[in-house]
Amino acid sequence: MTVALMWEARAADGRGAELLEWARAQALDPAPPRRETFTAPADRVLVITWWDAPYDADLPEIPSPPEELLHRPVHRWRFGSADADGP
């Protein structure tokens, strides 16, 4: 099964570039087969990692950044693939 972990944070005012740099620097062990980082208005950063694992597998996650970088707490979601064939 393919599992996607989503991590989203909104930076404190004027700290979007720092939050993006921090998120990109977070190494996961083991590294996921696929990882993408996105940005959006209001200094939001989204990281999605894809894993070949059962839905409830113990997978490494990006931690919460230092509080001074955040406008609000980090949001996290876990999704399982709905494709019958799966990648």
Language model features with spans:
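Active-site-flanking beta-strand signature of metal-NTP-handling nucleotidyl enzymes
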Residues: 2-10, 46-48
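Short, surface-exposed ligand-recognition loops at beta-strand->loop->(often short) alpha-helix junctions
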Residues: 8-21
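An amphipathic, aromatic/His-enriched active-site/gating alpha helix that lines ligand/cofactor pockets
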Residues: 25-35, 50-80
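Extracellular cysteine-rich, disulfide-bonded domains and loops characteristic of secreted proteins
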Residues: 81-86
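A short beta-turn/loop motif at secondary-structure boundaries
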Residues: 37-42
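Structured catalytic/translocation cores of nucleotide/phosphate-coupled proteins
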Residues: 3-6, 22-28
